[in-house]
Swiss-Prot record:
Biological-process GO terms, alphabetical: endoplasmic reticulum to Golgi vesicle-mediated transport; intra-Golgi vesicle-mediated transport; intracellular protein transport; late endosome to vacuole transport via multivesicular body sorting pathway; retrograde vesicle-mediated transport, Golgi to endoplasmic reticulum
Name of this protein: Probable coatomer subunit beta'
WD-type repeats, residues: 4-42, 46-84, 88-126, 131-170, 172-214, 218-256
Keyword Repeat on entry: yes
Pfam families: B-prop_COPA_B_2nd (PF04053), TPR_COPA_B (PF23953), WD40 (PF00400)
Subcellular location: Cytoplasm; Golgi apparatus membrane; Cytoplasmic vesicle, COPI-coated vesicle membrane
Assembly with partners or alone: Oligomeric complex that consists of at least the alpha, beta, beta', gamma, delta, epsilon and zeta subunits.
Keyword vocabulary terms for this entry: Cytoplasm, Cytoplasmic vesicle, ER-Golgi transport, Golgi apparatus, Membrane, Protein transport, Repeat, Transport, WD repeat
Topology of this chain in the membrane: Peripheral membrane protein
UniProt function note: The coatomer is a cytosolic protein complex that binds to dilysine motifs and reversibly associates with Golgi non-clathrin-coated vesicles, which further mediate biosynthetic protein transport from the ER, via the Golgi up to the trans Golgi network. Coatomer complex is required for budding from Golgi membranes, and is essential for the retrograde Golgi-to-ER transport of dilysine-tagged proteins.
Length: 796
């Protein structure tokens, strides 16, 4: 049975929804309502972006025309209306039919709008020709309920009608290519199968049935029964092998396209289901009901793709399996970090089940396919079936001849050389299994690790990881949980010794076999080990690596990209999205080896690797050394002047910092160096730095502390000439120049302070300052205050 991962993105309680559509690039859903309104919703923020009051009659059809920034809607007043969804301006309005408009479809490449109506016709309008009706399709005998353009041949389309038929048409011909007598009652919906392997149509009718048709042979392939009222729609999902149907019985049902069995039935308590739309890029689905709309996803976000160490990429498109070989980096002259890589794709074969998970064996010779409750192991080169069986989950051991399959919640079968070698019957219910050096079995809130050969419990750990990643030699393992991940060290000798001595606990395992080494507060999307370095992508859209207990950023990436792996031949990391857009980033393994040796304290051996590391990468290593406290080594390695200056300060190499400051000639750098020199009691260097950095406040402190009377006098004159009056005043005061202090206060029109200071410290200056104060008061119309001051000169 296929497992669904239902995640609700948007739920809105609204008036009856009659039509929905996705914007191809924005996170928007448009919905038209029975009350004559149209709303655009953002399913990421769950907010209404814009609302349009179109009219007061039902609007049964709407769609985005994204390449024109428009949306179009058709209603029961026979009108088609077109609006600019950015400005809210109505672009045009015209009568398309003499009766209710039931459906409309926008052609994916041509400037065509198809409409269908209760007048039993279909019309094609060309917006480049001022919305001229360029063709009318006649032949149905009742209301035409839905339209669908063939994604594999956009010159043809299908229509469904309440006369019980489905007709397939071609643009340019007014006569239907053929007619299917699809249902005993009205046909509400028609939809094309999106993949290239099957020429199928699906129909939904008022006889409560869903039917799958081969439009080449005109034969009914399968009838799906389960709804108890009129079926409003049945829809092939573009990403997963499922059919989604909705009915006036209020349910939305999910069916498997391979077995045609019912997987799941949902009732969202929104009454009758009327309409559906799908985002072809991300697989999101929106369904409209009597009482609102809901947007949701059903499958895993990760693409079904795997890559071996040579660069061979294998992925699936439904049950078709494709492959491509990534060309060596030296053959790609335009290769840059983050740029798209051109792939030469070929069809590798098909698989008998839908591959939810594809995984290369460690040696790259085999590829496992797991899905629909089964697994198949294929040879990687010829794509021949090597083994198969039941499996809810599949996991490879570090030994490519050993693998495990979870056949039920309490049973795991281990195979060796493609034959069953052991079986674990668990005392608890398990959710998932992981491969690697040990077999990881996830319970309700813990994970148990078992030895592949003996099935003995190695250790029970009280965390529930969503991902388990072993390095190649089995000494380290990452447990990736929802919000953080843990680095553990594994001591195999400790485990085997405990087993031999009989001290292994049957319920907890060997406590000392694992050691916690690091706890990192980041959410891992997926990851790979390269030697002793863990490379991973995060939910924050970053590509990072962990070495020791320190994390470092490689690049920011799109959130939709997933890690494929590292190719040593290219020294590059490769990532892909669901549409197999592959990008890469440089990752020099010599850098990692250098960092690993430094973490072990072997700086001498690390120095021997520097020849393999480019000058552009060395500043990053310099940062790494600095963070570990190796300031001198970081200084020697760095070639960036700004970085070297900071490192020289940290290493207290003031001579080197002084040379760099001379080169940079930045006042801020001089001031920083001056502070460092002051802390080192190097007053000569400090004075030079503060002078060149024009740090006059620090110079006052330095001259005062060293009793440099002449320095203060010179500083007083310098700051006075540059109008730094506070410093000039302090320097004049400290050098016992009260008259100069009065002069500074007067020049800045601080007359009250000047008179008070003069009267206190140099009375002879009052006769010069007081008249200026009085003149200033009079100028500001304060004659009474000026007259009341009296003759302070006489009093003194």
């Amino acid at each position: 049975m296929m497992r669904l991962d239902f995640q609700r993105k948007l739920l809105s309680h609204t008036e009856r929804v009659k039509a929905v559509d996705f914007h191809p690039t924005e996170p928007w859903v448009i919905a038209s309502h029975y009350n004559g309104q149209v709303g655009i919703w953002n399913y990421n923020t769950q907010t209404l972006v814009r609302s349009f009051d179109i009219n007061d009659v039902p609007i049964r059809a709407c769609a985005f025309i994204a390449r024109k920034n428009w949306f179009v809607c058709g209603s029961d007043d026979f009108q088609v209306r077109v609006y600019n969804y950015n400005t809210g301006e109505k672009v045009t309005q015209f009568e398309a039919h003499p009766d209710y408009i039931r459906a409309l479809v926008v052609h994916p490449t041509q400037p065509f709008l198809l409409t269908s109506s209760d007048d039993m016709t279909i019309k094609c309008f060309n917006w480049d020709m001022s919305w001229k009706c360029v063709q009318t399709f006649e032949g149905h005998s009742r209301y035409v309920m839905s339209l669908a353009i063939n994604p594999k041949d956009t010159n043809t389309f299908a229509s469904s009608c309440l006369d019980g038929t489905v007709k397939v048409w071609s643009f340019g011909s007014s006569v239907a290519n053929f007619t299917l007598q699809a249902h005993d009652r009205g046909v509400n919906y028609v939809n094309y199968y999106p993949a290239g392997d099957k020429p199928y149509l699906i129909t939904a009718g008022d006889d409560n049935l869903i039917k799958v048709w081969d439009y080449q042979t005109k034969a009914c392939v399968r009838i799906l029964e389960g709804h108890t009222n009129n079926v409003s729609f049945a829809f092939f999902h573009s990403k997963f092998p499922i059919i989604i149907s909705g009915s006036e019985d209020g349910t939305v049902k999910i069916w498997h396209t391979l077995s045609y069995s019912l997987i799941k039935s949902y009732n969202f308590s929104l009454d009758r289901a009327w309409c559906i739309a799908q985002n072809k890029d991300n697989g999101l689905v929106t369904v409209g009901f009597d009482n609102g709309l809901i947007t949701f996803s059903l499958g895993r976000d990760e693409p079904s793709v795997t890559m071996d160490s040579s660069g061979k990429v294998v992925w699936s498109n439904y049950n078709e399996v494709m492959s491509a070989m990534i060309r060596p980096a030296k053959e790609q002259s335009d290769l840059t970090d983050g740029s798209l890589i051109s792939l030469s794709v070929k069809e590798l074969g098909t698989t008998e089940l839908y591959p939810a998970v594809l995984k290369h064996s460690p040696n790259g010779r085999f590829v496992s396919v797991c899905g629909n409750g089964e697994y198949i192991v294929y040879t990687a080169l010829a794509w021949r079936n090597k083994a198969y069986g039941k499996a809810l989950d599949f996991a490879w051991s570090a030994d490519s001849n050993v693998y495990g399959s979870r056949t039920s919640d309490r049973s795991i079968v281990i195979h060796k050389n493609f034959k069953e070698s052991n079986r674990l019957d668990l005392s608890y219910s398990c959710d998932k299994i992981f491969g690697g050096f040990l077999l990881g079995v996830v319970g309700s809130d813990f994970i148990c690790f078992y030895d592949w050969d003996t099935g003995i419990l190695v250790r029970k750990i009280d965390v529930k990881p969503k991902g388990v990643y072993w390095n190649d030699d089995g000494r380290f393992v990452i447990l990736a949980c929802d919000d953080d991940f843990y680095l553990l060290g594994f001591n195999a000798e400790m485990f085997y010794s405990a087993v031999e001595s009989g001290t292994a606990d049957e319920e907890e395992g060997v406590a000392d076999s694992f050691e916690a080494l690091a706890d990192v507060s980041e959410s891992v999307v997926n990851g790979k080990w390269v030697a002793e370095t863990f490379i991973y992508t995060t939910t924050a859209a970053r590509l990072n690596y962990l070495i020791g207990d320190q994390t470092y950023k490689i690049a920011n990436v799109e959130s939709s990209f997933y890690l494929l792996g590292y190719i040593p031949r290219d020294d590059r990391i490769y990532l892909t999205d669901r549409d197999m857009n592959v990008v890469s980033y440089s990752f020099n393994l010599a850098i990692i080896e250098y960092q690993s040796l430094v973490l072990k304290g072997d700086l001498e051996a690390a120095q021997g690797l520097l020849e393999q590391i480019s000058e552009t990468d060395r500043p990053r290593l310099s940062d790494f050394l600095s963070r570990l406290g190796y300031k001198e080594a970081a200084l020697e390695l760095s070639g960036d002047s700004v970085q070297r200056f900071e490192l020289a300060l940290d290493a207290q190499r003031l001579d080197i910092a002084s040379q760099i400051a001379q080169e940079l000639d930045d006042p801020l750098k001089w001031r920083s160096l001056g502070d460092a020199a002051l802390n080192a009691w190097d007053f000569v260097l400090a004075q030079e730095c503060f002078e060149k950095g024009k740090d006059y406040g620090s110079l006052v402190l330095l001259y005062t502390a060293t009793n440099n009377h002449e320095g203060l006098k010179e500083l007083s004159q310098l700051t006075k000439s540059t109008k730094i009056n506070n410093t000039a005043f302090i320097c004049s005061w400290l050098t016992n120049q009260p008259a100069e202090c009065v002069n500074i206060l007067t020049s800045t029109q601080r007359y009250p302070e000047a008179n008070l200071f003069a009267a206190t410290y140099c009375p002879d200056e009052v006769k010069n300052v007081l008249p200026e104060w009085k003149v200033d008061l009079t100028k500001n119309q304060k004659e009474r205050i000026a007259d009341s001051l009296g003759d302070l000169e006489l009093k003194n």
